[in-house]
A protein has these predicted regions:
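Acidic, divalent-metal-coordinating active-site segment for phosphoryl/phosphodiester hydrolysis
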Residues: 147-149
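Nucleic-acid enzyme cleavage-core boundary/entry regions
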Residues: 1-138, 151-179
Length: 179
């Protein structure tokens, strides 16, 4: 929190690093010096959970406040038809997504598993910067596993989009058991 405050007051430059780098640069050394590193608890996962809480639940901050870098930036594309989004659970679908996105000038995102609130924040920020009207209807075409995990990933992505102002969505699942 102190780093965020210093960045916002322009006393320090934005971090421009990954969350994991933030953990290794600031949090882990501090816990180590305090004798508070735990081998029983995944404290990095706790950090991520706490930051997500501060961003999404308590709405105290945004990832861009600190300047975290989006490690999934290369796996998303904003198309001219930005309100049509083809997304997949797996990074391995990135080439397919890119081909379709280029052919039809649509947006695409390969999530790489459970979607990151940070990734969605920056994706929607890119839309805002491009002048995309977030109040219009968005059509989301999902390529996720036809199982509970896939549906959780799909629903989490849609929920994150809604959190960032994209609330008029229609989801079309492209994976069905009869395929």
């Amino acid at each position: 929190w102190q780093l965020r405050e210093r960045i916002l007051k322009k006393e320090k430059p934005p971090l421009r690093e990954l969350l994991r780098t933030f953990w290794y640069m600031y949090i882990k050394p501090t816990l180590s010096r305090a004798g508070a590193l735990s081998s029983d608890t995944d404290q990095y996962a706790q950090l991520i959970s706490n930051i997500v809480f501060m961003v999404k639940d308590a709405e105290l901050m945004e990832y861009k406040d600190i300047g975290f870098r989006d490690d999934n930036q290369a796996n998303r594309r904003l198309g001219g038809n930005a309100n049509i989004i083809l997304f997949s659970e797996k990074l391995g679908h990135q080439d397919f997504l890119s081909d379709i996105a280029n052919k039809y000038n649509i947006s695409s995102v390969a999530l790489g598993g459970q979607p990151s609130v940070l990734n969605v924040e920056y994706f929607v920020d890119t839309m805002r910067a491009a002048g995309v009207n977030l109040k219009r209807s968005f059509y989301l075409f999902s390529i996720v596993d036809y199982d509970t995990s896939g549906w959780i990933i799909r629903d989490a992505f849609v929920d994150d989009l809604r959190f960032y102002g994209i609330s008029h969505t229609q989801v079309i699942d492209l994976i069905h058991p009869d395929m």
